[in-house]
Regions:
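Gram-negative bacterial Sec-dependent N-terminal signal peptides
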Residues: 10-17
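Extracellular, repeat-based ectodomains that mediate carbohydrate processing or recognition
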Residues: 37, 54-57
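Active-site-surrounding "flap" and adjacent substrate/cofactor-binding loops of secreted or lumenal enzymes
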Residues: 101-107
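Bacterial N-terminal signal peptides that target proteins for export
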Residues: 1-9
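Short polar catalytic/cofactor-binding loops
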Residues: 58-62
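Bacterial signal peptide processing site
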Residues: 23-25
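C-terminal motif of bacterial Sec signal peptides marking the signal peptidase cleavage site
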Residues: 19-21
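An alpha-helical repeat/solenoid feature that recognizes helix-turn-helix modules
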Residues: 27-50, 64-96, 110-150, 155-207, ...
Length: 385
């Protein structure tokens, strides 16, 4: 009799364990893509402290950061991220910020750009470095910021007959081609620098942005799009690399560039910076795509490629939008809580992050850690709303 009771108890306990396990799995699924679950709040502060400790150890003697040596772009991203950490942590690490700012200032050029000696990706580096200076002390670095604004406005495509470049900025100083990512980074810098919405730079940008939008309403005569509200990388659709996510086939067999996460978030953010209202059909179309494709597990349509830059763009866009939740069908996501938990779960023991799927330099721990600190700062602000 005693033996039968023991067996029964064991079976009952096993059944309970299975029920708990299934409940935990369901909760995990809901937290990744569904509504709030009452899970423990992510320890954002602790994660940031560990990440800052890593960056202290990783800073080069010249004040810069980067796995391949100091770089203006990576250093700018680190400084911009550190500018937003909790004030007490920031004060304890003021020396890191001071050294980083000195490194940025040491790389100013006469044309207003801020770039390493190799002169590569001048627009991208200038946009990032200038935003870092704005975040630290706008008035103190006003002359440098003003010079960078003039430089950036000067490299925007201004020939209306050049559909590949008009209204956009690319990686470098040339005016041969532009893309949604570099244009968005530059426009964000111009917005933070206070460039008037009446400036022609925004009007030209709107033309470029409309050409990257997968919307038949925005498309020029004879141009077919995926018409899903998302965005692509370039404004000219019949070239290789028009979308980082490749192409899709329309019902009539026509291949068109596929929308993907980073481009669509960049589009929405840029439309808002350029002055377009939230209730505008173009803005609503982009936001609907974002809601429909919401996830914190991957970069929509690109999997793990560029995952951390996607997070970096995601938080800037959604914080600008201002809603702490996203609706996806019947599910309601607390995106800041879910994203913070996901980022923290990926942090390494030394406080850093890297992406095993090395694309766009995401094997560099200083770069990716800057993305993550910035993203966690944004999540924290939204959770405090």
């Amino acid at each position: 009799m005693r033996t039968r009771w023991c067996v029964l108890v064991v079976l009952m306990l096993a059944g309970s364990m299975m029920l708990v396990s299934c409940g935990q799995e369901e909760q995990g699924r809901q937290q990744g893509r569904g509504g709030d679950t009452g899970a423990v709040k992510p320890d954002i502060r602790g994660s940031i402290e560990n990440a800052v400790a890593f960056l202290r150890a990783a800073q080069h003697k010249d004040g810069g950061w980067g796995a391949r040596g100091s770089g203006v772009g990576i250093t700018g991203l680190v400084i911009e991220a550190l500018a937003g950490i909790p004030e007490d942590i920031r004060k304890k690490n003021a020396d890191l910020i001071e050294k980083g700012v000195k490194y940025i200032l040491a790389n100013r050029r006469k044309d207003g750009s801020i770039v390493n000696e190799d002169g590569m990706v001048a627009n991208y580096r200038t946009s990032i470095a200038t935003r870092a200076l704005i975040a630290i002390d706008r008035e103190k670095y006003k002359d440098t910021i003003d010079a960078a604004v003039k430089y950036t406005k000067g490299i925007q495509g201004t020939d209306p007959n050049d559909k590949a470049k008009f209204g956009s900025m690319g990686y470098g100083s040339d005016k041969t081609k532009g893309d949604i990512i570099n244009t968005a980074e530059a426009l964000e810098m111009l917005e933070k620098a206070g460039v008037s919405k009446d400036d022609d730079v925004w009007k030209r940008a709107m033309v470029f942005l409309s050409r990257t939008h997968n919307s038949d309403e925005d498309a020029e005569a004879g141009v077919k799009t995926a018409n899903d509200g998302g965005a692509i990388y370039r404004s000219v659709r019949d070239v290789e690399g028009a979308s980082k996510a490749g192409t899709i086939k329309l019902p009539d067999g026509t291949e068109v560039p596929r929308s993907y996460g980073g481009a669509t978030y960049a589009l929405l953010k840029s439309l808002l910076f350029a002055g377009m209202k939230k209730d505008h059909p173009r803005v609503q179309a982009a936001y609907k795509w974002i809601c429909d494709h919401y996830t914190v597990k991957e970069h929509p349509e690109l999997g793990q490629q560029g995952l951390y830059y996607f997070y970096f763009t995601m938080v800037r866009t959604l914080e600008l939008w201002g809603d702490p939740t996203i609706k996806q069908g019947a599910a309601v996501h607390n995106w800041a809580e879910q994203l913070a938990a996901q980022i923290i779960s990926l942090q390494k023991k030394d406080g850093s992050w890297t992406n095993p799927k090395d694309k766009w330099w995401e094997s560099d721990p200083a770069l990716v850690s800057a993305y993550c600190i910035f993203s966690l700062n944004s999540c924290q602000r939204m959770l405090e709303k």
